[in-house]
Amino acid sequence: MISIWGQIQNILEKSLNPGLFKVWISPLAAEVQDDVLRLVAPNEFVAAWVRDRLLDDIVQAATTVLGSAPTVVVDAAPQGAGSLSPRMGRAGASASAAVPGANAADGTQPVPAVQISSAVQAVAARSASGVGARAAHVAQPSQLGLPLDMPAPNRALNWRFSFDSFVVGPNNELAFAASRGICRETLSADTLFLSSGPGLGKTHLMQAVGRALCEASNRAAPRVEYLTAEEFATRLIAALKAREVDRFKARYRDVDVLLLEDVHFLQGKERMQDEVLATVKALKSRGSRVVLSSSFAARDLKNLDTQLVSRFCSGFLAHIDKPGFETRRRILCEKARLHQVMLPDNVTDLLADRIRTDVRQIESCLHNLVLKAKLLNRQISMEMAWEVLGHYAQQEVVMDFEGIVRKVCEGFGISPKQLNSRSRKREYVVARNSVFYLARKHTDLSLKEIGDRFSRRHSTVLKGITSIEREMSRETPLGRQVTNTLSLIERNGRITYP
């Protein structure tokens, strides 16, 4: 009988380029416990490559096999480990000291982990240099694979944003100043809490802080850890299962700056909250700085431990509002400059006037406009801008709650009765969460008032909104479906323009 990991590998083997599968998926060992899929790579080089480039493909394949999206953890095998767990591997693989990848059915023998480690690095090096030779003989390695410990966090991160590319306006100037202040240690508080709706610049500022600190020119540059609350929880689960909690604690409590995004994800997860609270306390006691972000103001995080909320509120609180017309216009000009195009003034004004929801939509609209002009080899014009705008929610949509419910039911093909039911059927849950998300975005209803309409608790609404935001941020079939459906509802469901 093919193991769960074997089934997942079969799907990946069909969907991925053969070279990608052979080099990066075959060497992985696997263990499935509850809703966690733990993958072990021969070394950190392979583990990091898989995390950065193939994690979404693995999650998608695992979801197909398991029926629900698991938490996927990719770790490197400890240095000098003679074998991997007997429970790990592909169907037919030996329970001895081997990494899966050899198929017992074809008569080949499993290859020891350290040998695969050497082979993988050799194949990757040849691929990068343009040499297409196939891996034939696995040479005896001259040294063991990299240890589990990652290098200094600063060097392991890839910062996409900087303070220089952040467009400052009345809506975000306080958050911008506070973020720069915590880098320069001119902010009187050692904790900064950033909050805003999705797509308004939290991630940009968080990464700008990390980048500014890591680019310090002296050798005393601070140690920085940057991750989301979901990643923190995933790594904690992996540490608990591997009985390496002390190692986990040492890693996150021994940094100079912790950047933790999307802390609203922690709601309802008591074990995770306890660890975050202990980590924040430890960091503050050693004089470290902590920067947190959330899609909700700290006061709205009512399903968190009161001590944790108190810690969040004890620092400097900075909220980012939606950008005004002039700020949106300057954002368009800055992004056009990065695209190396000259945007006509009338087109700039049109886009700035019509897209008011968030910065991410502004950037996406401009990107599609520039791409369309390049593909058609035409100049950007008002006519082309209007065509591209048809795919976006123009101006801030004004809908009432009943209208949102009606449009969501139409969009997801379900009835209001099914929407209000207690069923945990996937399409009903996604539709309900979509109503929560749109109601918070387009009405003045509080989270409690939204929950009351469905006879649900405040925490259920908060969790639903977080779930939708997480799906929309992922490049998965479900994420794309949710994004497209909600965009269509917003475009067709507007009543008036403000």
Curated annotation (Swiss-Prot):
One of its GO terms (cellular component) is cytoplasm. Plays an essential role in the initiation and regulation of chromosomal replication. ATP-DnaA binds to the origin of replication (oriC) to initiate formation of the DNA replication initiation complex once per cell cycle. Binds the DnaA box (a 9 base pair repeat at the origin) and separates the double-stranded (ds)DNA. Forms a right-handed helical filament on oriC DNA; dsDNA binds to the exterior of the filament while single-stranded (ss)DNA is stabiized in the filament's interior. Its main location: cytoplasm. Belongs to the DnaA family. GO terms for molecular function: ATP binding; ATP hydrolysis activity; DNA replication origin binding; lipid binding. Oligomerizes as a right-handed, spiral filament on DNA at oriC. Keywords: ATP-binding, Cytoplasm, DNA replication, DNA-binding, Lipid-binding, Nucleotide-binding. It is found in: Cytoplasm. Residues 156-373 are annotated as: Domain III, AAA+ region. It comes from the Bacteria. This is Chromosomal replication initiator protein DnaA. GO terms for biological process: DNA replication initiation; regulation of DNA replication. ATP binds at residues 199, 201-203. Residues 69-155 are annotated as: Domain II. Residues 1-69 are annotated as: Domain I, interacts with DnaA modulators. Domain I is involved in oligomerization and binding regulators, domain II is flexibile and of varying length in different bacteria, domain III forms the AAA+ region, while domain IV binds dsDNA. Residues 374-498 are annotated as: Domain IV, binds dsDNA.
